[in-house]
């Protein structure tokens, strides 16, 4: 278990100590575990113990004092030998209106506890819960409820004791934890008029417990995902998105990142902190929200690296630059942890902004504020940080009606003897949410910020969002990808470009115009997330005629190979179904973070700005494959290979009769080639963690799936093949008039 690193700043607090300085003894091994040192054996070095999963170290850490002796934080007795002890989960103290089995004093990792209700009561929550290796129970609190109260029975979490048994409007319940367990969440909750309990469900946890990234990421990601979906200014109809850090379209988000730079962090961890923070900033700025970011590092004193009052706080490049310039030694002369001063810096920033905008103005009152505090929760100077939080709540006028305007997240990283009580005291308390967490190490922190944006929570039609987490399915990575088929035989692919329109290739429909039997499969066809849609209308480009140049000896010609399908129903947005961004639209402009007034030409210059542009298409088996789109002089050399194809074009004298400027070209030796059946699928790029369709698969000189019925089997062309593989894709920048004609009421197009 790594040192409890809770901030984005690692400071070497004792550089250049004299050779005469004492060093601490080296007989500090732990039975069954290992240890790390932040600064060797010198005074100021933090020793952190680690144990295998399912065990925890006792003590968790020791600090080398200036006297040359080790001290265990919080210990009153002399040093004892460090050992690894088994992790245990707390037992129920009581269970109302039911029984639980087995009845133990505490439960080992892997142990289960089961719940049953008495007659007349209905079980809500998890009937069986298992003790996890982090000392936390899986599942949800089991409650036996008869529905008689104005609010539902709030239950009693494992290890907790509750006083208060009335659940009417205005009634209160109070919680405390048994033995040495620590309470996180709300110690008191009130039944509100809307039938919901105030605050956050209390949890009693072992002092050594921590949270898994897969638990923290959804909790943070739900808040930010709702916020991102709620701030899409291009949505034409309002949808109810629920609470979370929700911002009205006329509003703005101030995001404050507070990074603790104390002696318990190392330089390597500091680099991971900065990388994680930069990743989070990059992800948030990749969505079309109005956001300003403040960055504050602190030890004994705070250092404001970026203020929300600075215009650059709205510029992702400037914000990330400020993070990158955060110096490991910025706080080397400060040995304390002054969380109060860091939060007070936020308060002063808010106060200055309120004076600038005017306390009574909508411009001030509609700003939402989110504070992410990365710390060990061990403030040891400057006063109580809760006082600063109270000042912040007061200046923002946070009450029941304005509770959504402030969220404070307190996140600890590592496993020192964390002051859970202080972390819990600082974090916001809101129904159904958690705002205080402890992560095991900096790697876990990086995972959280990388995967915190759960796109399944975006009910808006925000475009170009793929789930890139490690456990995401192929369909979740490319949720715009659809399959088009007549009855049962798959023929083509396509891409969702809105909640009701699919873009595909015209040649998929050249055998007839009756589409009543055709289906479009949206989502993962191999799971419950797949759904078939009827086609309400097919719009085929009138310029497409595969035999248009047959009398010139060109047996097949694929100019204007583009079509639109309007689905009979709108697609419900989810992690498995979401439109891709089309260039030259306001939706794509926001995703690219381009300024207002940008044009279609600006998008082309940004997306297709190199001689060889890395791009992707989706294979028959759903995987994402790589190609390189050739531009400029490389486009010419790529296309000229067609002259070697004597079967389709026996008398070709001018390559441009076949490969017009409507086509993008790929297929060099390192590229994958599309198979028959992959036509119509999107050719797309990634920019700023968003995906943009620049073309669609049309035709090629080589079929890597020929002769194989296995969707996972692709055969590369031999190097000696004549002609070598080449693939051609309709260039959407060259089809703008047609797209605007048919999608003008669906998408918001930019000037050409």
Curated annotation (Swiss-Prot):
An example Gene Ontology molecular-function term: metal ion binding
Any S-S bridges, and between which cysteines?
Answer: 24-64, 51-84, 89-131, 117-144, 151-191, 177-204, 463-581, 492-508, 584-600, 638-665, 675-705
Q: What is its EC number?
A: 3.4.21.43
What is the stated purpose of this protein?
Precursor of the catalytic component of the C3 and C5 convertase complexes, which are part of the complement pathway, a cascade of proteins that leads to phagocytosis and breakdown of pathogens and signaling that strengthens the adaptive immune system. Component C2 is part of the classical, lectin and GZMK complement systems.
* Record protein name field: Complement C2
CDD domains from the xrefs? CCP, Tryp_SPc, vWA_complement_factors
Can you supply a Gene Ontology BP term from the record?
A: complement activation, classical pathway
Provide the binding site for Mn(2+).
262, 264, 337
Q: Where is this motif: MIDAS-like motif?
A: 260-264
Point out the glycosylated residues in this chain: 29, 112, 290, 333, 467, 471, 621, 651
